[in-house]
């Protein structure tokens, strides 16, 4: 059977269960689609996951990019057979107790284990690290944040990024320019952060600047309004994405929208309007999750935006470890020691640091 050559489009969709239905196969062959995000509902066990990712990748060439939210703590989509990952604030606690060096070493090990285990199952990308500061206000962020100190967040995120690279994965910093100060959960409401740009620059933006300089591959903006900067949510704002992120910070990587079905995005209109505004603001790729009907509505008559960088940016997000290489790494004593170390950092309290996120439970 000839695999069709279909360039990756700018939409990331999802699927319902453990295997692809015929309807989903046809949807994923649409030129609008370039990637797929998996959730806990798509995971039964490791062998099933490997079969699913192979099935997805066999549909077309270049292969669809497969992503997942797999941060640790409350946001770890795959559990059985995977190392239980700590919430990121555990690394911040190590920073406070044992110092920066110990915390950075731990963060590197977490990133390495996280990425290698996903790579072994055919996953290209985890949407991590969270760069939001822990201001103590936002339950949906909570212990997903490394720390309140911008330097600690940046250094721990950079160490995690280096670990991810050892496991074949790129990084995606979120939620630009910072979701940690607001109380509202943008899955449910459209939060507002009333601080000035100078205040944001002095704290929340610092990790994004540092990580951008250090090779962060992707960014996901927040569905949060910062009215002193722009009346539009960051993910719909040319000021935030084209002027501040691209021009001022100098970020060259991929901009993924956060899920366009979240309540924080719904005020922009229907799904076609949300996507149009996202692309015009500067997003390369939009996520449409948990609503296949909206994916179908979006792709009906969809015109792929003119983005000369899209193909290269998608390609850059591909996993860099081949199957044989990752299997060999998994068998080494060093990697198995890293798994044991990371598992020892996790505890039941890691899942209790705030509300559930998407499909975290």
From Swiss-Prot:
Pathway: Cell wall biogenesis; peptidoglycan recycling. Keywords: Cell cycle, Cell division, Cell shape, Cell wall biogenesis/degradation, Cytoplasm, Glycosidase, Hydrolase, Peptidoglycan synthesis. It catalyses: Hydrolysis of terminal non-reducing N-acetyl-D-hexosamine residues in N-acetyl-beta-D-hexosaminides. PROSITE patterns: GLYCOSYL_HYDROL_F3. One of its GO terms (molecular function) is beta-N-acetylhexosaminidase activity. One of its GO terms (cellular component) is cytoplasm. The record marks 185 as: Important for catalytic activity. It is found in: Cytoplasm. Its EC number is 3.2.1.52. The keyword Cell cycle applies. SUPFAM superfamilies: (Trans)glycosidases. Substrate binds at residues 69, 77, 144, 174-175. It comes from the Bacteria. The active site is at residues 187, 258. One of its GO terms (biological process) is carbohydrate metabolic process. InterPro entries: Beta_hexosaminidase_bac, Glyco_hydro_3_AS, Glyco_hydro_3_N, Glyco_hydro_3_N_sf, Glycoside_hydrolase_SF, NagZ_Beta-hexosaminidase. PANTHER family: BETA-HEXOSAMINIDASE, BETA-HEXOSAMINIDASE-RELATED. Belongs to the glycosyl hydrolase 3 family. NagZ subfamily. Plays a role in peptidoglycan recycling by cleaving the terminal beta-1,4-linked N-acetylglucosamine (GlcNAc) from peptide-linked peptidoglycan fragments, giving rise to free GlcNAc, anhydro-N-acetylmuramic acid and anhydro-N-acetylmuramic acid-linked peptides. This is Beta-hexosaminidase. The lineage of its organism: Bacteria, Pseudomonadati, Pseudomonadota, Betaproteobacteria, Neisseriales. The gene is nagZ.
């Amino acid at each position: 059977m000839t695999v069709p050559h279909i360039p990756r489009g700018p939409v990331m969709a999802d699927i319902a269960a453990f295997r692809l239905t015929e309807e989903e196969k046809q949807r994923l062959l649409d030129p609008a689609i370039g990637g797929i995000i998996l959730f806990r509902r798509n995971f039964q066990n490791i062998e099933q996951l490997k079969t699913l990712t192979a099935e997805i990748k066999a549909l077309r060439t270049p292969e669809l990019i497969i992503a997942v939210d797999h941060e640790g703590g409350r946001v770890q989509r795959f559990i059985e057979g995977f190392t239980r990952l700590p919430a990121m604030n555990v690394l911040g606690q190590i920073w406070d107790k044992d110092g920066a060096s110990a915390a950075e070493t731990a963060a590197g090990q977490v990133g390495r284990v996280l990425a290698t285990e996903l790579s072994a199952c055919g996953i290209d990308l985890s949407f991590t690290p969270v760069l939001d500061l822990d201001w103590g206000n936002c339950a949906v962020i909570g212990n997903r944040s490394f720390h309140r100190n911008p330097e600690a967040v940046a250094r721990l995120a950079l160490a995690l990024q280096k670990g991810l690279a050892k496991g074949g994965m790129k990084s995606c910093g979120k939620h630009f320019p910072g979701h940690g100060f607001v109380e509202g959960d943008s899955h449910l409401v459209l939060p507002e952060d009333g601080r000035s740009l100078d205040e944001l620059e002095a704290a929340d933006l610092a990790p994004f600047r540092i990580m951008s300089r250090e090779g962060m591959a992707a960014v996901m903006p927040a569905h949060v309004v910062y009215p002193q900067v722009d009346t539009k949510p960051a993910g719909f704002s040319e000021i935030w994405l084209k002027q501040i992120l691209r021009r001022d910070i100098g970020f060259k990587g991929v901009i993924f929208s956060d899920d366009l079905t979240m309540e924080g995005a719904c005020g922009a209109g229907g799904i076609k309007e949300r996507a149009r505004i996202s692309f015009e603001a500067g997003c390369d790729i939009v996520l449409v999750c948990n609503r296949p009907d909206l994916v179908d509505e979006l792709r009906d008559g969809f015109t792929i935006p003119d983005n000369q960088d899209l193909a290269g940016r998608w390609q850059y997000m591909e996993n860099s470890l081949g199957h044989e290489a990752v299997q060999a790494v998994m068998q080494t004593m060093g990697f198995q020691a890293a798994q044991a170390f990371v598992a020892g950092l996790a505890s039941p309290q890691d899942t209790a640091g705030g509300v559930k996120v998407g499909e975290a439970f």
